[in-house]
């Protein structure tokens, strides 16, 4: 159920976020406690998830120090009290139709592509790699930006050039990798591997490229404990992969290849997911989630 904010016009609902108009140049983005997996929005909420995602994004926007869409602090007076801590005022941008994915390790859809072709997004990789193998250098592996209910598809860099032009494509690749390396280096000092992550970018009225949406959240990134890392095995994680793993387990009873939506998450999976998201934030930021603003604080 989305917040009813009388001062602002509701514009759109995403899998997790609600979008409202503040004025001609600014939007209010509200992160809900919904969780999605395998292109479904699950019939379960993760308590405090929206606040965790917002706290994580705010921390990383400050850390990477890249031009971004933020138009005010997390306690901006334009944010209604009922969504404080899970909402941000941002600049309205023309969003680019590319998911910008940075990968430091072979996992997820990248692993599936490699097993099928020896490549990821058209990039040829050495033979003999296994799940969770670390790349010599991080890869830029873009994807299409799918509509709600559809599936993102990995694409080549040449396809990015066809979509946004050569200059913008190079900007997207270079900015994505620079931001990823800076954040991944920091996380490693905190005992966490950022295996991969995805960004969205938009352009302002002057054509400047700005980092937008969420960054380095447990929804958009894979987080692994560095002290447990070993290539070739399933990694423990502090992210949404924990939910994906349960959905495809015998315990859930769900047939991913069928036409039925996933079942609701049991209480122990909901609580464990919340704990993992909080642990990711606290480990990487060095801050206590109990100190974050908003209802529930």
Swiss-Prot record:
Name the Gene Ontology molecular function terms of this record. ATP binding; phosphoribosylaminoimidazolesuccinocarboxamide synthase activity
> GO cellular-component terms in the record?
cytoplasm
What reaction(s) does this enzyme catalyze?
5-amino-1-(5-phospho-D-ribosyl)imidazole-4-carboxylate + L-aspartate + ATP = (2S)-2-[5-amino-1-(5-phospho-beta-D-ribosyl)imidazole-4-carboxamido]succinate + ADP + phosphate + 2 H(+)
Its annotated pathway reads: Purine metabolism; IMP biosynthesis via de novo pathway; 5-amino-1-(5-phospho-D-ribosyl)imidazole-4-carboxamide from 5-amino-1-(5-phospho-D-ribosyl)imidazole-4-carboxylate: step 1/2
Q: Report the InterPro entries cross-referenced here.
A: SAICAR_synt/ADE2_N, SAICAR_synth, SAICAR_synthetase_CS
Q: Does the keyword Nucleotide-binding apply?
A: yes
Q: Which CDD domains match?
A: SAICAR_synt_Sc (cd01414)
**Similarity annotation:** Belongs to the SAICAR synthetase family.
Q: Protein name, please? A: Phosphoribosylaminoimidazole-succinocarboxamide synthase
Provide the species name: Mycobacterium ulcerans (strain Agy99)
Name of the gene encoding the protein in the UniProt record: purC
């Amino acid at each position: 159920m989305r917040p009813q904010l009388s001062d602002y016009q509701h514009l759109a609902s995403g899998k997790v976020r609600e979008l409202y108009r503040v004025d001609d140049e600014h939007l209010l983005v509200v992160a809900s406690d919904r969780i999605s997996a395998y292109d479904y929005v699950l019939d379960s909420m993760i308590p405090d998830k929206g606040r965790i995602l917002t706290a994580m994004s705010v921390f990383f926007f400050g850390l990477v120090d890249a031009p971004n869409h933020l138009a005010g602090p997390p306690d901006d007076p334009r944010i209604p009290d009922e969504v404080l801590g899970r909402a941000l005022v941002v600049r309205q941008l023309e969003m680019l139709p590319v998911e910008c994915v940075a990968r430091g390790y072979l996992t997820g859809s990248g692993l599936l592509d490699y097993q099928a072709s020896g490549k990821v997004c058209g990039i040829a990789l050495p033979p003999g790699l296994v799940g969770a193998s670390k790349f010599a250098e991080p890869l830029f592996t873009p994807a299409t930006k799918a509509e709600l209910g559809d599936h993102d598809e990995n694409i080549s860099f040449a396809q990015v050039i066809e979509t946004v032009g050569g200059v913008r494509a190079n900007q997207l690749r270079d900015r994505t990798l620079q931001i990823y390396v800076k954040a991944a280096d920091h996380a490693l000092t905190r005992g966490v591997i950022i295996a991969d992550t995805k960004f969205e970018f938009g352009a302002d009225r002057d054509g400047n490229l700005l980092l937008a949406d969420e960054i380095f959240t447990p929804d958009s990134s894979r987080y692994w404990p560095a002290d447990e890392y070993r290539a070739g095995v399933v990694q423990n994680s502090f992210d949404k992969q924990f939910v994906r793993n349960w959905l495809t387990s015998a315990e859930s009873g769900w047939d991913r290849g069928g036409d039925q939506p996933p079942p609701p998450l049991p209480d122990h999976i909901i609580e464990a997911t919340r704990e993992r998201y909080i642990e990711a934030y606290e480990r990487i930021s060095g801050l206590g989630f109990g100190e974050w603003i908003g209802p529930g604080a």
